[in-house]
Every structure is written in C-alpha cells, then in structure tokens.
C-alpha cells in the first residue's frame, strides 16, 4: 500500500488526475471504475481540463460506476447517473455506450446486479478503480459487516450514511434507503486501486484503513489485501496517522 499526503484537497485532486491520465496514456482502452460524491469532483475537474488541453483522450475508455441509489431515475438530479454526466461525461469525448452505471429503477434488481458483474467481466475487468471512503470506512455502499467476497448487490444504507448524504437532498427523509453497489469482492478484482480522502471527518477512517486490523467493521481495511493500492489524502485526512508511521509515507507539499 502506497500512501501520498498532499497539502490540500486541490493537490490531492491533481495527483489523482495525473494517475488516471498516465493509466489512459499507457492503455487507451482502459477500464475505469469511478466514484461519486464530493471527494472525486476535483479530480474530474482536472481531467476535464486535461482533455480540453488535448492531453488525454477518452474515446476508447470504458467506465463502470461503483453504485446507484435505488428508486432514482437517471435524470433525477441526485442520481449518480445525473452526477456523472453533469460533472464529467458531458465534458469529455467518452462514448455513451462505454459508460456503465447501475440502473436504480430496474424491474429486477437482482438481475441488474448479475448483469453488471457480467459487463465488467466482458470488458476485461477494471484496470483502475477510484474510491472514496465514508466516515465509517465504507467503500462504494459496502457498509460495515459486509462480506469481503460480495459481488454487485442491493444494500440497505445505514443511518450514518443517510445522514452523511442528506446534504445533497432537501432532508434526510428524501435520501433513498437502498442502493446497488459493487461488492468488496468486485472492487478487489481491480488491477489497481486509488482511494481518495479529504478533511478531518475522514481522518479516523483513514487511520484505521492504513494501520488498523483487517475487520468487516471498517470495510476499507480489506484494501490491505490488494497488491496495488495507492491512498491519496490531504493533511487533514492524514491528521491521525501516528508520527512514527509517517516515515514510510510520501508527502507532497
């Protein structure tokens, strides 16, 4: 596991974008696993700027998003489908048929999960998976106590996650109670993983992910079992990492 500490959110976002750019340069038909939420927004902004400067070509890139709320249509402003197109896909030259996001209004949700796994396999698996992390250590919508072998599945969101996401809605009551998410087993199949975190509210989850014991209570600790993980965090998210452990960490200021 490689850990990079940056001075702030902006530098974290820039570093993450550079890693994605390098991946696509090396493999133009890269399969990216993508995340939503406020954390990767800066990375998407930098990738759009790189595209506009002619530094990156998304025309052969394939993407799979981690998750989607159940019950929200793709055009709902709080759906992750809407988020991705509004904040990223509409601003680059990606082919719409190469974009994959779980369908939260599918008639048969179990079948939707099975098909999503099939599509990932058909694409050759995920080359580079981008992750955020919840304050309780969840990745995707894999909440505490999930099996580390799960594939794409339907989850019931915890009150903690609902409260964390209510800022995107008018009230907590409007936050969907269920979602489709790629499972921990699906995520761990990615060839490379980059996890992003920013802010003091993520510091405890980051400390546990980097130095804690492997436990389903903190889903992100499973990343210690993956052979190619890079964690990029700002100083605030790194604030609880013990000083003696900082010697092993790359710090970018």
UniProtKB/Swiss-Prot annotation:
One Gene Ontology molecular-function label: glucosamine-6-phosphate deaminase activity
One Gene Ontology cellular component: cytoplasm
Function, in words: Catalyzes the reversible isomerization-deamination of glucosamine 6-phosphate (GlcN6P) to form fructose 6-phosphate (Fru6P) and ammonium ion.
Taxonomy, superkingdom: Bacteria
CDD domains registered for this protein in UniProt: GlcN6P_deaminase
Family the entry assigns: Belongs to the glucosamine/galactosamine-6-phosphate isomerase family. NagB subfamily.
List of catalytic residues: 67 (proton acceptor), 136 (for ring-opening step), 138 (proton acceptor), 143 (for ring-opening step)
Reactions mediated catalytically: alpha-D-glucosamine 6-phosphate + H2O = beta-D-fructose 6-phosphate + NH4(+)
Keyword Hydrolase belongs to the record: yes
Keywords in alphabetical order: Carbohydrate metabolism, Hydrolase
Coiled coil: none
Annotated SUPFAM superfamilies: NagB/RpiA/CoA transferase-like
Gene source species: Thermoanaerobacter pseudethanolicus (strain ATCC 33223 / 39E) (Clostridium thermohydrosulfuricum)
Protein name (Swiss-Prot/TrEMBL): Glucosamine-6-phosphate deaminase
EC number: 3.5.99.6
GO terms (BP aspect): carbohydrate metabolic process; glucosamine catabolic process; N-acetylglucosamine catabolic process; N-acetylneuraminate catabolic process
Involved pathway(s): Amino-sugar metabolism; N-acetylneuraminate degradation; D-fructose 6-phosphate from N-acetylneuraminate: step 5/5
